[in-house]
From Swiss-Prot:
Its main location: membrane. It is found in: Cell membrane. NCBIfam families: 2a6301s01, PRK12645.1. The chain crosses the membrane at residues 4-25, 30-49, 79-101, 108-127, 131-153, 166-188, 208-230, 243-265, 270-289, 302-324, 339-361, 373-395, 429-451, 472-494, 526-548, 589-611, 621-641, 646-668, 672-694, 707-729, 767-784. The keyword Ion transport applies. May form a heterooligomeric complex that consists of seven subunits: mnhA1, mnhB1, mnhC1, mnhD1, mnhE1, mnhF1 and mnhG1. Disulfide bonds: none annotated. The gene is mnhA1. This is Na(+)/H(+) antiporter subunit A1.
Amino acid sequence: MSLLHIAVILPLIFALIIPILYRFFKRIHLGWFVLPVPIVIFIYMLTLIKTTMSGNTVMKTLNWMPHFGMNFDLYLDGLGLLFSLLISGIGSLVVLYSIGYLSKSEQLGNFYCYLLLFMGAMLGVVLSDNVIILYLFWELTSFSSFLLISFWRERQASIYGAQKSLIITVFGGLSLLGGIILLAIPTQSFSIQYMIQHASEIQNSPFFIFAMILIMIGAFTKSAQFPFYIWLPDAMEAPTPVSAYLHSATMVKAGLYLIARMTPIFAASQGWVWTVTLVGLITLFWASLNATKQQDLKGILAFSTVSQLGMIMAMLGIGAISYHYQGDDSKIYAAAFTAAIFHLINHATFKGALFMITGAVDHSTGTRDVKKLGGLLTIMPISFTITVITALSMAGVPPFNGFLSKESFLETTFTASQANLFSVDTLGYLFPIIGIVGSVFTFVYSIKFIMHIFFGQYKPEQLPKKAHEVSILMLLSPAILATLVIVLGLFPGILTNSIIEPATSSINHTVIDDVEFHMFHGLTPAFLSTLVIYILGILLIVTFSYWVKLLQRQPGKLTFNYWYNRSANVIPNYSEKMTNSYVTDYSRNNLVIIFGALILLTFVTIFSVPFNINFKDVSPIRIFEVCIVILLLSAAFLILFAKSRLFSIIMLSAVGYAVSVLFIFFKAPDLALTQFVVESISTALFLLCFYHLPNLNRYNEKRSFQLTNALIAGGVGLSVIIIGLIAYGNRHFESISKFYQEHVYDLAHGKNMVNVILVDFRGMDTLFESSVLGIAGLAVYTMIKLRKKRQTQGNEVKNHE
């Protein structure tokens, strides 16, 4: 096993160990045991920077099911390294922050188990080269995030948010599964790199459009893009460390990673360019607009996260235009990939810090309601300093890193407006217009975020707690991120050659080796747009109290949340009615549906799929075998029209004993003896059970009822015969019986092949089957004993009375 595999598996292993440690070390905060895990992974990933800088990659394989092309293949290039550093780096800071945020009285064993489970799943997503393995980790992120969001399960809002996120992201996961299966059909491979190398085969496939749509849905749901964004604001009910980790730097970035990774395959389609770009821009505009009217600090950051994800998504879509050009023109559009990567890093720094400060404010005051907050400037000066730095970066104000990536974003939108896709030139001007409007509202909610907390009147009477500055443990992580905001703003070259260029080259076929970010490029359209954004933003802040009321009057039926909630109520009701229509307490009706579906499926398959039935090697039929079969069929037929229970039991036993005789003729005495014993015991049990049932010596059934039973029974029997004959005549693999014939004597040292298979080759199966029977017996014994105990207690009460 390689170190890369260990890096992915390590958090998963510790996720199993941590709950055990929690039981023995309750006096020590469990976070200290967890902290080394992401730190070690982060340090290991740092050692791989030189590898990706030189243009090399790391490919490691761990065999799983090689015959089916499914192995635990890991592939690390510049893009995978970038996300791995974010996952482990931000993860380290979040764990450190959580030590100060969560008290020892919380269920820390559960919390850190879920967190490590999520961390390992995210590393698996960004490093997997096998799409099936990627999908498994993808769904594991949804499952673990569900557990994290619902950590405070006593709160109804937490349960609602967790269910909402799970439903939407799992829906996207199923779409992703469909998309990757369609990708694997033309390439006959599950390897992402192989698919990229053979992208032309996929593009010529009739499944190309469907695969593209399904994969985009999977990415849009995960990254909370319009209209699937509604799960993210409700997920803010999770503890703040979860919000800082999942919803700023990791989980919501998984969709962006998927779009970036699949761009070489789908970028040739103009539909990919337009859809990814417009969905990103619409998300940017809609979420930034909604962020301005939120009354909860986390609500502001939730919609802020959605809008920033939309910005990055739009840049990835614009960058895909480079696949439609050659030479220098291609490099011009490929610069959007560079801007997307840079802003992805910047967003993780300032948004992670802002979430942590929000948690600090909530921890200090007991509320996140902006109506109750204000005037905390002198009470929480360190938190104020960190907030100003990171919020101004989010607003796109120099000299912070957010300004550089925002300028790059505006430049890419102006560049995209000149692209002649679909021969609709004027439509391209929507890109900079939407980008500027979205940036204006981004500026507004960023500045208002600072004002809501630290300016205005201090209202101690409305605060559940007395406000105070939080501990150093809660300030250290956001302070580190705020420092990165300043450093990356002043010295962006630190990342260009080491991180950004290798990540960009993983997405784009055009090599860009002159990446530079500057505070001032001259009087460019992007710089002039920035001035317009500042002016309009300040005007909107001054008039905020007037126009924000219009946004808050938005009719409920026009929101996606309304339709989600309505669907969540209506669908279960209709599902229950539909289920009750065919699932009843009468087991016979349930069996009719199950067996009827089997019969239908069998005959539909027979008439739609070519097959071969081979009677060449069938053994000859002897006269006594025919007699036994006739006896067996006669007994089975009589069961259908029996008039008494006793007669049904006798005929059912006759069927079983006839099968035992057939086993003897087929030279399987062990099976015959087993069948004989089972039939004898079953018959005795049936008779004992019916003795205690109501005295119904005779019962009449309608002729149609009996005929239905006969048709179902005959259809099932015929289906099994046909399936058996088809399986016998269409063998795609060599029979395993030869293996047993060769090794049953020399390896197992046995003479009876059936016995050896049961107790040796399949010994574990037999052991667990015996265990199941034993547990069932204990359960029956316990129920009988409890019944006797209750009867005894009841008699004692009566005697006492």
